């Protein structure tokens, strides 16, 4: 059974005014046989934590939900080139065929190992260190450098 949860913000985009991804996937599912389409559930509003805890696998396209799944101990499957990919706590695929082959061969671990969870923690610490700005003078200097502000503005 496959559950697809669309991004909750997509319907609110000003330039689209519809849940474009959800609509396109729904169109595709309608073209499938009843045998296949009956095994797919599309949703916009479902508690992500509940969905993660009920799932055998979490497959994402550069979604924050993969990081949330990892917090819950799941080893997310990341398709594409997410900023958190290749950091030691995700299954990473550029090819659907490779992903499907590994899925069929039962090569995908559902849960993170202790070392993989450590990799998640290290990634998050480094990510936050580089993304957050200190309230001290060093943080102001960092902002000036990042934003290329003249020092007299700060």
Briefly describe each language-model feature range.
Residues 89-154:
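Leloir-type glycosyltransferase catalytic cores
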Residues 33-36, 62, 107:
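Alpha-helix capping/termination and helix-coil
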Residues 8-23, 56-60, 109-132:
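A broadly tuned preference for mixed-charge, low-complexity surface segments
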Residues 1-44:
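Catalytic donor nucleotide-activated moiety binding site of glycosyltransferases and closely related
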Residues 26-30, 66-69, 83-86, 101-105, ...:
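Glycine-rich loops and low-complexity Gly/Arg-rich segments
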Residues 17-21, 76, 92-94:
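Short secondary-structure boundary/capping segments
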Residues 44-91:
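A donor-sugar binding/catalytic signature common to diverse glycosyltransferases
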């Amino acid at each position: 059974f496959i559950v697809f949860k669309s991004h909750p913000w997509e319907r609110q985009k000003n330039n689209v005014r519809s849940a474009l991804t959800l609509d396109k996937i729904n169109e595709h599912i309608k073209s499938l046989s009843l045998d296949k389409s009956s095994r797919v559930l599309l949703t916009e509003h479902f508690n992500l934590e509940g969905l993660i805890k009920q799932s055998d696998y979490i497959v994402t396209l550069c979604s924050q939900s993969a990081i949330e799944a990892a917090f819950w101990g799941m080893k997310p499957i990341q398709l594409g080139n997410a900023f958190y990919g290749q950091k030691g706590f995700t299954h990473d695929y550029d090819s659907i065929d490779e992903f499907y082959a590994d899925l069929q061969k039962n090569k995908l671990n559902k849960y993170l190992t202790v070392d993989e969870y450590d990799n998640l923690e290290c990634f998050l610490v480094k990510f936050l260190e580089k993304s957050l700005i200190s309230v001290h003078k060093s943080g102001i200097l960092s902002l000036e450098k990042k934003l290329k502000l003249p020092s007299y503005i700060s």
